[in-house]
């Protein structure tokens, strides 16, 4: 019995590791939009048309924005919209159409105590959080991914361009995004 359960688990794990590509047609206007690929691994949120990071609401939720990547172990299908893929691309990602020529703030969180995954394991590591901002240009393709260099969480943003049959990458300058200030109403009215 144990051997059969182990075989079923091994087969499920093997199949979960096979990323599929779900290609979606997204409304994309090169004159007003940009595209961005976000790699899985760290919890990642987009905040549109702001250079600061909105405050989270009750229990860590809210603050607007959009969750674009979360660590996951079961649903590993990529969502693609036709962006070029560089040779060094990670295996699992989602792609999005975003407004160009407006600031995009990206927050990334990694670590901390997490809930048990489907195997019953609990992963614990130091909680790290960063937020960065940049202005995507119209008609350009980007990718964003977290890295952990020197035990410090980093956000990397690269611009993609196709030259001949190759996809080239170029680092994009990003700035720290502070927490947004809560504006209190003026008591004088």
Model-identified regions with their sequence ranges:
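Short loop/turn and low-complexity linker motifs enriched in small/turn-promoting residues
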Residues: 18-127, 131-133, 141-189
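Sec-dependent bacterial lipoprotein signal peptides
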Residues: 1-21
């Amino acid at each position: 019995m144990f051997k059969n359960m182990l075989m079923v688990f091994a087969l499920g794990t093997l199949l979960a590791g096979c990323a599929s590509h779900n290609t979606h047609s997204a409304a994309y206007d090169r004159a007003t939009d940009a595209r961005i690929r976000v790699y899985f691994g760290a919890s990642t949120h987009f905040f549109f048309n702001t250079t600061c990071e909105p405050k989270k609401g009750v229990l860590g939720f809210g603050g607007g924005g959009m969750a674009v990547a979360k660590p996951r172990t079961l649903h590993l299908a990529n969502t693609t919209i036709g962006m070029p893929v560089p040779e060094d691309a990670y295996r699992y990602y989602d792609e999005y159409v975003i407004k160009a020529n407006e600031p995009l703030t990206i927050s990334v969180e990694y670590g901390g105590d997490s809930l048990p995954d489907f195997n019953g394991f609990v992963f614990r590591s130091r909680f790290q959080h960063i937020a960065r901002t940049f202005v995507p240009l119209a008609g350009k393709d980007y990718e964003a991914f977290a890295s952990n260099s020197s035990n410090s969480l980093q956000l990397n943003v690269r611009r993609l361009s196709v030259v001949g049959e190759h996809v080239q990458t170029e680092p994009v300058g990003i700035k720290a995004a502070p927490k947004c200030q809560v504006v209190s109403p003026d008591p004088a009215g």
